[in-house]
């Protein structure tokens, strides 16, 4: 049994765990492992927003342009494509890229082909919305959890490998305790979302500044290779409850501290749906994410179902990754997106702006 925290990230713990040292988890789970050369990763969520079938071809072309840019020097080591319909009826094509270090992502994003595309006046006049939500957690600021050991998705795809069975799972509070930084830091949030350029009500280009310790969760489901019984388990038993919880967070986020929630379906380059999905949730703080997870009926039902079936899972792949960030390691930028998009909804326009 291993700790979820890599040996090179372990230090004397000043904050106590929720379980005793003798705790044994009820079933096996694993985490992504990276060596001490990985200091900080970058997660880039690059979106194209549209409404109506007449805009779909142009939106798909724009998505393909973004993906083509990943082939340039310093492009991400891993990416995937997703689709989301928000509660205003807009469709969003989201290209998600992962970089193993900040410098390569910076070189990529500032290269002339990429920066000129994003900064072009065409982005303001082509009838689509665009956004980029880019965050860069340090190695001690993110955790992963997988019910499988191969072909890790998300940030796991840019790590070196996978752990043995880990100890920190199967109890409330284990998510926090998989963060290396949790050994000595409560990861308390401070500040608020602020609009620092533009006006969401007007449109055009809008930039939102984040605050310390915003939390981002990506929680995924892969039923592509599942047999009939596991497909039924997911589609008939897990998905309805999951969808209910995700819709609640999408529509009632401010009441519980959730800035943005998108339950997305993976797609291919032509926009066809794949049998994979995940949730993208931005939270005002990790403790607010914890409170919702531990108390809301929909999540409690999901958690109970997972506990019941986890040990017998074969080809239904379930996982999550959670991260927090310093304010300086976040960028939220929107072009002609509706004011309820992403971090725009809860961002405050200050007097000095």
UniProtKB/Swiss-Prot annotation:
What is this protein's name?
A: Aliphatic aldoxime dehydratase
pH dependency: Optimum pH is 8.0.
Organism phylogeny: Bacteria, Bacillati, Actinomycetota, Actinomycetes, Mycobacteriales
The residues the record assigns to binding an aliphatic aldoxime are 219, 320
Gene Ontology MF terms in the entry: lyase activity; metal ion binding
Record InterPro entries: OXD
Alphabetical list of Pfam families matching this protein: Dehydratase_hem
- Assembly notes: Homodimer.
**Can you tell me which residues the record assigns to a coiled coil?**
none
Family (UniProt): Belongs to the heme-containing dehydratase family.
* Organism of origin: Rhodococcus globerulus
Reaction catalysed?
A: an aliphatic aldoxime = a nitrile + H2O
Keyword match Protease: no
Cofactor(s) annotated in UniProt = heme b
Q: Where does heme b bind?
A: 299
Notes on activation and inhibition: Active when the heme iron is in the ferrous state. Activated by FMN, Fe(2+), Sn(2+), Na(2)SO(3), Na(2)S and vitamin K3.
Query: EC number(s) for this protein?
Result: 4.8.1.2
Q: Which keywords does this chain's UniProt record carry? A: Heme, Iron, Lyase, Metal-binding
